[in-house]
């Protein structure tokens, strides 16, 4: 009995010692000026801005996986498009009178020009190397069929010619011309089918994972930057001086440490909402999230890959979210060309591809459950669409592919599960809750913590989104002469609009193309097209948009 008692006492002492050691470890505070949560392109971009603006600031980046850029920024987990509205028809909605609205397209294109300038500047500084490893010229095309859709594309093309950002776009309804642009799309197609296409040579395919890895590798060269992998944030607590104490667990050895930061950025993709809620700031109460995944069909067969050099976007079918538009894309991944077709929507309660099935449930609170219910009730068409997508069979997906590639063979394609996209649901005074497409920077009033929510257009606009964050949380510094000069060196067009200024547009496109090794020819005269017949549009309930 004495032996048993002694053994139990010994175990208790041992366990207590382990517990005390863990507490001691957690109590050892690391201090940093900026804490970046998440090792994706958003954190990498913000860190790169701050490194130039305030080189003496210390920065710590924590990432729960074993490497950076392994979630949504990973090249295989997104479409890899340099979104600039050259081909994405959802950015040019049709008004009730049949005319085309281009405001959203212009804004998206302006944003991507900022990203191009940011990347070009980093190449010139030696931060980014070998541009072909992360960005390549791939023409962007819109392709439609049927009388109404052809008429829509005519009207869209005519409307976009009013903007300096879309000069150089080509238009054709000729089968032979379109076949020259995208042979894979036209071969085997009914020669009597009415089709139309636009093509812009300066489109791009971007590997956001590679950009992320290179940006972070450059940050790591400085002694006042620390990267902690396999590290998960477990708690955030505001201190009396408005700094933050963030508890971070080491997923490999189970220990924990506290990091005291003057500013915290939550760039954790799908996990950002839960961490924002954990912070306890009142601004977080307005938000909820709904996860949607995406799948692509992938071909690596040289007979397919070498026969297609374009990103070809179609038009979303009636009743489907505008952003769900199918596309067949040339991609450059892991140093080789592949072709992807999709996306097909999938559903999982995970907020991250490497997340937990409890993510959706654990993010649902008393303050956001009603907005979520209102969104579900108000968007039954969207619910129907998601259910229909989840129910798709292998044959259904292949038939969808054949609409864009009539001579496709099943054996050339495999299914790939891409990343999760958490859609923003925001409290609304009139509707209770609304589904918000796009990204949103949410910060506290003091400007000590900020999170990025949302999924589209995402990585392609990381540079302007983080610029917006700087203006929101570091407003006084942004207006200072020092920061203004640095920001204009990073983004030459900062503070100006390129749209409407032909000379400035061409100057920036030529500069970024030269530095990034991209194709750019001075735009020629616009193609002549049949005059679009603008028909008043029937009144229909708008389908909420989502990002896939």
UniProtKB/Swiss-Prot annotation:
Pathway: Carbohydrate metabolism; tricarboxylic acid cycle; oxaloacetate from (S)-malate (quinone route): step 1/1. InterPro entries: FAD/NAD-bd_sf, MQO. Residues 530-541 have a biased composition (Low complexity). Its EC number is 1.1.5.4. One of its GO terms (molecular function) is L-malate dehydrogenase (quinone) activity. Pfam families: Mqo. The gene is mqo. It is an enzyme of class 1 (oxidoreductase). This is Probable malate:quinone oxidoreductase. Its cofactor is FAD. The lineage of its organism: Bacteria, Pseudomonadati, Pseudomonadota, Gammaproteobacteria, Enterobacterales. Belongs to the MQO family. Residues 521-548 are annotated as: Disordered. It comes from the Bacteria. It catalyses: (S)-malate + a quinone = a quinol + oxaloacetate. GO terms for biological process: tricarboxylic acid cycle. Keywords: FAD, Flavoprotein, Oxidoreductase, Tricarboxylic acid cycle. SUPFAM superfamilies: FAD/NAD(P)-binding domain (SSF51905).
